[in-house]
From Swiss-Prot:
GO MF, one annotated term: rRNA binding
Positions of [4Fe-4S] cluster binding: 111, 115, 118
Primary residence: cytoplasm
Cofactor(s), names only, from the UniProt record: [4Fe-4S] cluster
EC number per UniProt: 2.1.1.192
Role description: Specifically methylates position 2 of adenine 2503 in 23S rRNA and position 2 of adenine 37 in tRNAs.
Domain of life the protein comes from: Bacteria
Misc. remarks from the entry: Reaction proceeds by a ping-pong mechanism involving intermediate methylation of a conserved cysteine residue.
Organism field: Thermotoga neapolitana (strain ATCC 49049 / DSM 4359 / NBRC 107923 / NS-E)
Protein name: Probable dual-specificity RNA methyltransferase RlmN
Gene Ontology cellular component terms for the protein in this record: cytoplasm
NCBIfam families to which the protein is assigned, alphabetical: rRNA_mod_RlmN
Record text on cofactor binding: Binds 1 [4Fe-4S] cluster. The cluster is coordinated with 3 cysteines and an exchangeable S-adenosyl-L-methionine.
Binding site for S-adenosyl-L-methionine: 158-159, 190, 213-215, 289
């Protein structure tokens, strides 16, 4: 049987009509799934019993199994631990802002990148998520909380561009007006920098936002923080960003986790401003969050000095206010909390 959440709109219409159902039945099914959060064909009462029985023979609509939910006492940020059908686990986060709700979703079980300041990488890599598993995080959170998600950031567990096809397909599903109906400009992909995939993304015709997790201005320092940098250098990544901007004209957010004594020197700030010169970027400075790595954030004075250097050199920058750090839901804190099975 096929997972209905793996299917694009056109694929679903094709599947439905091949079973002898009218085309408009696809819209009825999607209304039940995406609007009403119903994943049981028996509850789809505007379909005949015969049609429901037929659909059950061919499709499943698996929402995720909730294992644990933690709510921040500081800001209401909510973290969900989900179990997948094969017993593996992932985490997703719902973040509340005035007038909007943002979901932070995962694209892989674990992560192959292994950033030294990130808890996810410490768990190792198990497998890519399917398109349906990515989409189901949104539906499962909305069903659990009874609230509509308006913004999505692909900043959870995993590197989205190393699960490229499923990530892109999930974005198209979440954006489709008869499916997720989330505005394309309200969707952000965060990447450590896979040059060929950044350029491929530019050709997709998707008006998503792109965030680059840079974290260091030199290869020497970035090699230590982001091991994948040994394969893709800072220069290669920034060249890909240049091509991306030539093709799309879009500004790119640069994410920079500040770690005391590692990448927070004034010389780091000056070098960062130098390598970003000429690019259309905005820098998010993120004081490192507590993880088992034992790294610590710089002093407030040092963070402000770092930001000031960037501003003085014409680089827009802000200090990101992290949400959910008390429940390990902030940047770099998501991880596998239970034993995982091998692929």
């Amino acid at each position: 049987m096929k997972n209905l959440l793996d299917l694009s709109y056109d694929e679903l219409v094709s599947e439905i009509t091949s079973l002898g159902l009218e085309r408009y039945r696809a819209d009825q099914i999607l209304d039940w799934v995406f609007d009403k959060k119903v994943n049981n064909f028996d509850e789809m009462t505007n379909l005949s019993k015969q049609h429901r029985a037929l659909l059950k023979e061919h499709f499943t609509i698996p929402f995720l199994k909730l294992l644990e939910k933690r709510v921040s006492k500081i800001d209401g940020t909510t973290k969900f631990l989900w179990e997948l059908e094969d017993g593996n686990t992932i985490e997703s986060v719902m973040i509340f802002h005035p007038g909007r709700i943002t979901a932070c979703i995962s694209t892989q079980v674990g992560c192959p990148v292994g950033c030294t300041f990130c808890a996810t990488g410490m768990s190792g890599f198990v497998r890519n998520l399917t398109t349906g598993e990515i989409v189901s995080q949104i539906l499962s959170m909305e069903k659990e909380e009874g609230k509509k998600i308006g913004n999505v950031v692909y900043m959870g567990m995993g590197e989205p561009l190393l699960n490229y096809e499923n990530t892109i397909k999930s974005i198209r599903i979440l954006n489709h007006k008869k499916m997720g109906n989330i505005g394309i400009r309200r969707i952000t992909i965060s990447t450590v920098g896979i040059p060929e995939k950044i350029i491929q993304l530019a050709d997709e015709g998707l008006d998503v936002k792109l965030a680059l997790s840079l974290h260091a201005p030199t290869n020497f320092k970035r090699d230590q923080l982001v091991p994948l940098n040994r394969k893709y250098s800072v220069e290669e990544i920034l060249n890909a960003i240049k091509v991306y901007q030539m093709k799309t004209g879009k500004r790119v957010t640069i994410e920079y986790v500040l770690i005391r004594g590692v990448n927070d020197e004034i010389s780091d700030a000056k070098k960062l401003a130098e390598i970003l010169k000429g690019l259309k970027v905005f820098v998010n400075l993120i004081p490192v969050n507590p993880t088992v790595a034992g790294l610590s954030k710089p002093s407030r004075q040092r963070i402000l000095a770092f930001k000031r250097i960037l501003l003085e050199n014409g680089i827009e920058a802000e200090i990101r206010q992290e949400k959910g750090s008390d429940i390990e839901a902030a940047c770099g804190q998501l991880r596998l909390k239970r034993k995982v099975s091998s692929p």
